[in-house]
A protein has these predicted regions:
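Self-maturation zones of extracellular/virion spikes and adhesins
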Residues: 2, 59-62, 121-123, 149-150
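Terminal (often C-terminal
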Residues: 41-120, 130, 139-141, 182-201
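Short, conserved beta-strand segments of beta-strand-rich sandwich/propeller modules, principally
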Residues: 106, 168-170
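Beta-strand signatures of extracellular beta-sandwich domains
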Residues: 125-129, 170
């Protein structure tokens, strides 16, 4: 079958048409606006999952001990039209967080400490698992408390959640002195974790 090169076709003369066997380099010029078309296999735009869970109850910490934060978590109230998650949102059980969909996530752990004695560095940790069993620390941060006072410490990491059944996270803190607390609240974020899906895995 012979091929004919078409230089110009008036838009008013084409009702329906198919372009077959033509490389993208053969197409040039401005394309008309598409209205009422159904396009498939296009990447989704914007952030599809974002959530916050906060710690609700101020709690004293045991000196020289790493503590897993396994209770007193809640999602902020959505009824006041101020906070709203994006997408399905995270699930939490005994401090273990399950992701709603696969993807690359930015996970942040923000802890507000209060202390009444000098401290070495209080630490915070993000732990992750790839088998729903063994956890390893993927992010750690620390701050120095001096006498009576408060401080906020932040740790963060990108996580590749290729499997929502086995890849999960949890959060820990460490007190380097006596009389240390992490502050919780049920009406605002003081100690909390954020989860934002950035891209496909």
């Amino acid at each position: 079958m012979s091929q004919t090169e078409v230089q110009l076709i008036k838009s008013s003369s084409v009702v329906d048409g198919d372009i077959v066997g033509m490389s993208s380099s053969k197409l040039s010029g401005a394309l008309p606006a598409i209205s009422g078309a159904s396009l498939t296999n296009l990447p989704a735009g914007g952030i599809t999952q974002a959530d916050i869970f906060r710690f609700t109850t101020s709690t004293g910490l045991t000196y020289d001990t790493v503590t897993v934060i396994d209770s007193n978590w809640e999602r902020p109230d959505e009824s006041d039209d101020v906070f709203d998650k994006i997408g399905t949102g995270m699930s939490e059980s005994s401090g273990i967080f399950t992701f709603p969909a696969t993807g690359i996530y930015l996970v942040q752990w923000i802890v507000r400490f209060y202390g009444t004695s000098n401290s070495n560095a209080n630490h915070i940790y993000i732990d992750a698992t790839v088998n729903n069993s063994t956890y390893v620390t993927v992010a750690q941060s620390a701050g120095l408390m001096s006498g009576n006072g408060q401080m906020t410490v932040i740790a963060q990491s990108f996580l590749d959640i290729s499997d929502t059944t086995n890849r999960k996270v949890r959060f820990k803190v460490y007190a380097a002195a006596n009389n240390q607390q992490i502050l919780g609240n049920t009406s605002k974020q003081e100690t909390y974790a954020t989860f934002i899906r950035l891209a496909d895995t």
